[in-house]
A protein has these predicted regions:
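Intrinsically disordered, low-complexity non-transmembrane regions of multi-pass membrane transporters
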Residues: 95-128, 268
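Transmembrane helix-loop junctions in multipass membrane proteins, especially transporters and channels
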Residues: 68-69, 87, 91-103, 153, ...
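Transmembrane helical segments that form the transport core of multi-pass membrane transport proteins
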Residues: 127-208
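Juxtamembrane loop-helix boundary motifs flanking transmembrane segments in multi-pass membrane proteins
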Residues: 19, 37, 111-126, 139, ...
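Alpha-helical membrane segments and immediately flanking helix-loop junctions
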Residues: 3-66, 179-200, 206-232
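Alpha-helical transmembrane segments
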Residues: 72-88
């Protein structure tokens, strides 16, 4: 297989791309708990299936923040390409043919349970799990929004901005973007909102930084994923490595698309 993952792993990738953070990680963890995939295969899934959803990228970021659906589609294309690239790179993560788990084995072990379980119980468990996940996501967003406000009011954010100034100078990125970038590293939505609102003659910088933050996810998303993965025997390392690589690749793909297709050239 392209990702060295059983076919059922495609469900985690598709749902992760469609539903946004942290659905991919939750599905990968559930696969491990139910022995659908081996530990190594689930860790590979963790590295690339946890992504921002198209509704958030196109609707919230593209249309609401940047005022352009084209920018939203540009960010989405780069995001997906980067995710697939990371998945291909991680196909060799702890690769061992003996570690593969047969889906037939899973079916034989759990067929009786699936038959006995009634529809009401299944729906109830799904709804309960969904509500808990939504509350967790909302709680993290609120907490980190408060943290950002505290950092901003206490001038700690200003200190952090000065720390990354040499890097921004090296990359020829205006210092006006530093606050938005740091905010995005902490909490993705707040950071993207700041970056998209900065008036800059070269809009490509806004888009490139947004692409990086969208793929990285930030500390808030990382802790969401960690709270899910901690309930299993999976390592969080593939997720960390994968998100860093995805952020880099996503930025590169965005840069290539902007400079290769006139429809994506937003230099004003």
């Amino acid at each position: 297989p392209f990702f060295n993952i059983p076919g059922e792993g495609s469900f985690a990738l598709i749902m992760g791309l469609l539903s946004g953070y942290p659905v991919g990680a939750k599905i990968a963890t559930n696969f491990r708990k139910n022995n659908i995939c081996s530990k190594e295969e689930c860790e590979r899934l963790l590295s690339f299936t946890n992504n921002s959803g198209p509704l958030f990228i196109i609707g919230s970021v593209g249309i609401s923040m940047f005022g352009s659906s084209v920018i939203g589609f540009l960010l989405l294309i780069s995001h997906i390409l980067a995710s697939i690239t990371v998945g291909f790179i991680f196909k060799f993560w702890k690769y061992n043919k003996k570690s593969k788990t047969s889906l037939n084995t899973y079916n034989s072990k759990h067929s009786n349970t699936l038959n006995i379980s009634n529809l009401g119980e299944i729906l109830g468990n799904c709804i309960t799990s969904s509500i808990n996940t939504i509350l967790m996501i909302g709680g993290f967003v609120v907490i980190f929004s408060v943290i950002l406000s505290i950092l901003n009011s206490s001038n700690i954010l200003y200190i952090l901005c000065n720390l990354i100034k040499p890097i921004f100078d090296l990359l020829h990125i205006p210092q006006t973007f530093s606050a938005g970038f740091i905010s995005g590293i902490i909490e993705i939505t707040n950071g993207l909102n700041i970056i998209s609102s900065i008036p800059e003659k070269q809009l490509s910088i806004n888009i490139l930084l947004s692409s990086f933050i969208l793929s990285l996810g930030g500390i808030s998303v990382f802790l969401q994923v960690w709270s899910i993965v901690a309930k299993s025997d999976l390592s969080i390392k593939p997720y960390i490595y994968g998100k860093i690589l995805q952020a880099i690749f996503s930025t590169i793909y965005t840069f290539i698309l902007i400079n290769s297709f006139s429809i994506f050239n937003f230099n004003l």
